[in-house]
Amino acid sequence: MIKELEFLKNKDGFLGIDNKTKFNEKVVVVPFGLEKTVSYGGGTKNGPKEIIKASHQVELYDEELNYEPHKKIGIKTLKPFKIDKNINKALKKISLINENILKKKKFPLVLGGEHSITPGCIIPFTKKFKNICLLHFDAHADLRESYLGEKYSHASAIRRCLDYKNVSLISVSYTHLTLPTSSW
């Protein structure tokens, strides 16, 4: 189990906000830049760093709510972790991180990396809640049983999530299915 969570300085974290609180935040941003099973191009390992960097340009005020939501919920960003090259070990690690965060009554917001991390991310939720619904936005269905010999490929990430009987799926915007995945 991950014993202690180490955080970035607030100005270096998600949104670049200056939270003075000790650890009253309800949201913990988890940068997890896994890049293992991509089949076209690369760079997913830089995703969390680039998302956090871009988030510093976001306007914090919400005109519908008439306040800055981060001030009510609080957000803290974990320091990046060393990610194992072995996909099974990487998935176990992100699962343990999320489990630790949930035990502290916080909500993990994971920034990937490739989306093969999704099954590892949801495991603690499948244990904590009777039913969960996964909302999936992607150009592909990611429902293959395996891809290029890898059961935990980015192309089978959502299929692995559906291995848990208490997970249902809403998938939006994919462009095509394969014959074996069309029954899902």
Task: List each language-model region with its residue ranges.
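Metal-dependent C-N hydrolase catalytic cores
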Residues: M1-C133
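Active-site histidine-anchored catalytic micro-motif
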Residues: K106-V172
